Amino acid sequence: MNIFEHSIKNVDKGNVVAIVGTQWGDEGKGKIIDILSKYSDITCRFNGGGNAGHTICVGDKKHALHLLPCGVLYENNINILGNCMVIHLKTLMKEINNLGNNILDRIYISEKAHILFDIHQEIDAIQEIRKSKDGNAIGTTKKGIGPCYSTKASRIGIRMGSLRNFENFKKLYIKLIDNLMDLYNIKDYNKEEELNEFYTYHLIFKDKIINIISYINKSIDSKKYILIEGANAAMLDIDLGTYPFVTSSSTTLGGIFSGLGIHHKKLNLVVGVVKSYLTRVGSGPFLTEQCNEIGEYLTKKGFEYGTTTKRPRRCGWLDLPMIFYVKYINCIDIINLTKLDVLSGLKEIYICIDYKNKTTGELLERGNYPLEYEQLREYEPVYEKFEGWDEDITNCIEFYELPENAKKYVLAIESYIKTPIVWIGVGPTRNNTITRKFD
């Protein structure tokens, strides 16, 4: 379905569509972004860095993308790295070289995005070691994301635009690195080698670094189809997520407007991606986590290992109070439900439909969410039980082909969150997707 030219229920079509994760990441956003990129003219990343990981399966081939938008897989697509990204150019070059086919011709980078240096990754590792000694490790990807955003917030970071003038960049670089080496007592760091690398990046990228605000707004006004790709997910938002167990950028709807320089009235449609169960990487509260054979089953069958870190993900039942909250802050119009096939083979499946206060027995108001760890500990999940199914559903191409119990599960989710579920993932590839019709 070409979502840019197709209205669904009370949701009007439009030329600017955003895809956002509704949980703790790893919902399978990459697949729906890949499907919709076929119809878009421009695909944009607005936040984060190499800590994101989108795995796209095209036939027998897997593409793991960390910085590049998923639109790079389509030759008709221009791909933009936005203002609020932090970009490790060594990682970006590796992705570009792995994909080949003149990918660089279709990439533009915001002059306002910040450069992530190797020293940021060293600092990330140092900070995690220090926190782990106190039992307070966040479980970061150690990709340098937090330290890079820290230098940005401290106003000593270096933007991509500075790389266009290498002599000026060199002065800024030496000042920054000397500052960080002194601050973190780093004795050995090869500045000369990294500067040589960055001279190469200067030659490669100097004409690809642009004012994306002007570019995107002109494209929107000329009715180009714009697909906006969220990295990480809502519950990892630096302000609105389960702080401090979050990422370092704004992952929710508000991040789009600063990350791309567009105003809210230009955004037509928001697609929320919901995994059929729940996963989390690293530390942090997780009320529906299954530390048992169910959790192990979901990890193995769902191949729940981080695209970036390769760490096994923690697994549990779908948490609807989380979705109610995320729907409020993201104004979600339609849903893509992913990885329904992973639940095949379970005798019973549970959905958390409410949070109940352990002391008072009161149910949490829907749309509210206890983000602080101490608050969350006051609640326990209230489950609704569903009968499972044994059938392999990976070859289902229409909703009616699903087993009755699978259909009941999907319709129950849709009923609770009062948002149409348009796409249902039933396997890893583009073709393993059911598109429901609402005409």
From Swiss-Prot:
InterPro entries listed in its UniProt record: Adenylosuccin_syn_GTP-bd (IPR018220), Adenylosuccin_syn_Lys_AS (IPR033128), Adenylosuccinate_synth_dom1 (IPR042109), Adenylosuccinate_synth_dom2 (IPR042110), Adenylosuccinate_synth_dom3 (IPR042111), Adenylosuccinate_synthetase (IPR001114), P-loop_NTPase (IPR027417)
SMART domains according to UniProt: Adenylsucc_synt (SM00788)
Pfam families hit by this protein: Adenylsucc_synt
EC number: 6.3.4.4
Binding-site residues for Mg(2+), renumbered to this chain: D26, G53
Keyword line: Cytoplasm, GTP-binding, Ligase, Magnesium, Metal-binding, Nucleotide-binding, Purine biosynthesis
Catalysed conversion reaction: IMP + L-aspartate + GTP = N(6)-(1,2-dicarboxyethyl)-AMP + GDP + phosphate + 2 H(+)
Subcellular locations according to the entry: Cytoplasm
Biological-process GO terms, alphabetical: 'de novo' AMP biosynthetic process; IMP metabolic process
Alphabetized GO MF terms: adenylosuccinate synthase activity; GTP binding; magnesium ion binding
Active site, per annotation: D26 (proton acceptor), H54 (proton donor)
Cofactor: Mg(2+)
Binding site residues for GTP: 25-31, 53-55, 62, 307, 313, 339-341, 425-427
Residues that, per the record, bind substrate: T307, T308, T309, K310, R311, P312, R313
Co-factor binding details: Binds 1 Mg(2+) ion per subunit.
More info: Parasitic protozoa lack the de novo purine biosynthesis pathway and rely exclusively on the salvage pathway for their purine nucleotide requirements.
Assembly behavior: Homodimer.
Record function comment: Plays an important role in the salvage pathway for purine nucleotide biosynthesis. Catalyzes the first commited step in the biosynthesis of AMP from IMP.
HAMAP family with a match to the protein in the record: Adenylosucc_synth
Descriptive protein name: Adenylosuccinate synthetase
Biological source species: Plasmodium berghei (strain Anka)
Gene (UniProt): ADSS
